[in-house]
Amino acid sequence: MSDTPQHIIIKTGTDPRNRPEFNAIREEINKINHPARPEVNWGLIESLALTLFRTHGVDLQTAVYYTLARTQKNGLAGFTEGCELLAGMVVGQWDHLWPEQPQARSEILEWFNTRVSNQLRQHDFTRDDLRLVYRAERALQLLYDKLQQVELKRVPRIENLLYLMQNTAKKLESASDAAKAQQTAAPLKMPPMVYLSVPEAEPVRTAAAAPEPAANIE
């Protein structure tokens, strides 16, 4: 499976539980809590989810599994792509999403919040991640705002992920500013002076003055 970001056209799907791709995804996801700790095939989950998106449409449960797989395989970049997909679905397609029950949607997003938070806390953020952090923060803000507007008995704690991205952005901004300040304040390094070793000058030898001829006195 290529790690190149996939362009997904959001077309909402119906109940995917009768689809073999969805059942295969669930089998892999169930390995997470298996006592034997078998290896989860995240690449397979990603591939099967994309197949479902193309042939059956996008549902909330599969989109969450897809985002988790992308995060596992591609770190912050995968997480950001998944958050943008989820934000687009929840904000633009809330009335048409599967599952239809608001409580089921809350449970799915709460499960996602817990699982992906554990993955992100293992990520070593650097200043190069700042652009992706901004994108993820924006998507999570849209997602959070929408969840505050709809009627839910229990609102999933997406703000935990939002705060994580906001705090990470502040830390990376501070590190970037400090690095720039240090670079600006660094003293100008001059190349070392070059000293030429010149042999001591020999004493100037002058010709002995010839005796002046004696004056002839007559």
Language model regions located:
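Polyanionic, low-complexity intrinsically disordered segments
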Residues: M1-R26, I32, A36-R37, V58, ...
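Residue at a conserved register position within TPR or TPR-like alpha-solenoid repeats
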Residues: R70-T71, L120
